[in-house]
């Protein structure tokens, strides 16, 4: 009988895969090959999901900011442009949190953005007259 040098390692690696597949349906949690395929597929989805999560949160933040901006009489793009013109550098996560939890503070930010846009517009009109 030939000598087996990888027995312990193979058993451990298979056990690891089957442990990861516990909770999967039918043979995907019992048979090594099916479990391996299911685990690989699951890991791919997990990897993609970690990348998607960033996009999804950014979209959610923008939706929340836009809703509060519309209530304050501004569009999202004008609001963000107004904040940049005012020199405020707040990220979307913070803005969405303020919009969700502190309506008065968000209205102050919207007024600040409106005034910065008005100053910028008046400066542009003054340059056009010259």
Curated annotation (Swiss-Prot):
Domain of life: Bacteria
CDD domains: Ribosomal_L20 (cd07026)
GO molecular function: rRNA binding; structural constituent of ribosome
InterPro entries registered for this protein in UniProt: Ribosomal_bL20, RIBOSOMAL_L20_CS, Ribosomal_protein_bL20_C
PROSITE patterns linked to this entry: RIBOSOMAL_L20 (PS00937)
Pfam families attached to this UniProt entry: Ribosomal_L20
Keyword Transmembrane recorded: no
Gene3D superfamilies: 6.10.160.10, Ribosomal protein L20
GO CC annotations, alphabetized: ribonucleoprotein complex; ribosome
Keywords assigned: Ribonucleoprotein, Ribosomal protein, RNA-binding, rRNA-binding
An individual GO BP term: ribosomal large subunit assembly
Keyword Protein biosynthesis on entry: no
Protein family: Belongs to the bacterial ribosomal protein bL20 family.
Role noted for this protein: Binds directly to 23S ribosomal RNA and is necessary for the in vitro assembly process of the 50S ribosomal subunit. It is not involved in the protein synthesizing functions of that subunit.
Xref: NCBIfam families: rplT_bact
Protein name: Large ribosomal subunit protein bL20
Name of the encoding gene: rplT
